[in-house]
Amino acid sequence: MAQLRMFQVDAFTKTRFAGNPAAVVLLDTWLPDAVLTAIAAENNLAETAFLVATAQDGYELRWFTPTSEVPLCGHATLASALVLADEIGLSPPFRFHTRKSGTLQVDRSETGYSMRLPRRTVVPGGDPAEIAAVLGIPVLETRFVPVDGDDMVLAVVADEGALMAMRPDI
């Protein structure tokens, strides 16, 4: 049986067992998607990041939930950069080439990690009344962000107080 190098990282925190956990798996070559999904299912975290070094300037990066591949995962990307820097001993910035989100760059400064995300097109769309019913707060307007495999609706609310009053009905 092949051995895999795998790490679990709590993103967005300096405290153990806090933040947003993600697994990071370093691969020599890509495994079949069914195997990547099975590994993510066994990890039982929101996302598992899989990395393969490229011949050029970075890494190919893919993210899997316990059931499927997703087009983008911010916290697992940051976790991947931390593993490359702190566990493997490489120096940022890191360039991650993805299948559905373009190239992401992660850098590190004295204050922490930062990531450059792809620019997305925002178009009119979504039903404010429907989104308001789900969020449990008044929604002023909605916008649609088409992303291959992960379309998003943005809700505009009056202020931070409205956002803090949100009680989602999911």
Where is each model-derived feature located?
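Active-site proximal loop and beta-alpha junction motif in alpha/beta enzyme cores
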Residues: 1-73, 78-170
